[in-house]
């Protein structure tokens, strides 16, 4: 069972309250449907594409974040530092590692590195984590939709190359029901100094 909700509205400070409502609401629904003796909390996965990256020569396959990307990474840390995140995953590239580093530093959590071409390995690790955990994932414009689909969410198109402001909250209930909420955060305008060619 999959339910897909798509909110295209942009949030700044209120988004933290909205995220809290989503997380608490998912927990309440799971507790209500569980038996009195065995209440199982849902698992929540927060996914983003890496932040904006620098324009680099074609031979450089691993660019750093641009100034706009660094700003977005700091915004992620501010938004999610109080969200009860238990684990952080990012691919091996600098742009994904740098996207989650401010958040990892604030929470004093390690960044679990996963191969970009092995999304199935990440999906297995997420499924193996205990119920009730909130997990943060930074991926790429092609891998984020792939991970969402593999976890039981809807089939989504590849994220447009110029979009870095999509935020996905996937909730997996104890009965296997999946709910996806899509939000926008931060700046929506491509900034100078970012690459427009690689995912």
Question: Model regions: which residues?
Answer:
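Bacterial N-terminal signal peptides that target proteins for export
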Residues: 4-19
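Bacterial N-terminal signal peptides
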Residues: 17-28
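Membrane-interface motif at the C-terminal end of an N-terminal transmembrane signal
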Residues: 27-35
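Active-site-proximal alpha-helix that buttresses catalytic centers in soluble enzyme cores
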Residues: 34-131, 144-158, 163-173, 177-199
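Acidic/histidine-rich alpha-helical segments that form the ligand environment
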Residues: 133-135
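Short beta-strand segments
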Residues: 138-140
């Amino acid at each position: 069972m999959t339910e897909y909700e798509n909110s295209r509205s942009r949030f700044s400070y209120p988004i933290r309250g909205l995220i809290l409502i989503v997380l608490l609401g998912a927990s309440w629904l799971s507790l209500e449907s569980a038996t009195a003796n065995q209440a199982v909390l849902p698992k929540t996965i927060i996914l983003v594409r890496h932040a904006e990256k620098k324009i680099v020569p074609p031979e450089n396959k691993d660019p750093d974040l641009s100034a706009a990307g660094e700003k977005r990474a700091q915004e992620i840390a501010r938004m999610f530092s109080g969200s009860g995140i238990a684990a952080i995953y990012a691919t091996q590239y600098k742009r994904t590692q740098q996207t989650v580093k401010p958040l990892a530093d604030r929470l004093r959590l390690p960044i679990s590195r996963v191969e970009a071409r092995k999304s199935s390995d990440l999906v297995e690790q997420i499924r193996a984590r205990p119920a009730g955990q909130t997990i943060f994932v930074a991926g790429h414009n092609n891998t984020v939709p792939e991970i969402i689909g593999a976890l039981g969410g809807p089939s989504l198109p590849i994220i447009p190359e110029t979009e870095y402001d999509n935020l996905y909250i996937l909730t997996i209930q104890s009965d296997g029901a999946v709910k996806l909420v899509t939000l926008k955060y931060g700046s929506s305008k491509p900034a100078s100094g970012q690459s427009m060619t690689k995912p």
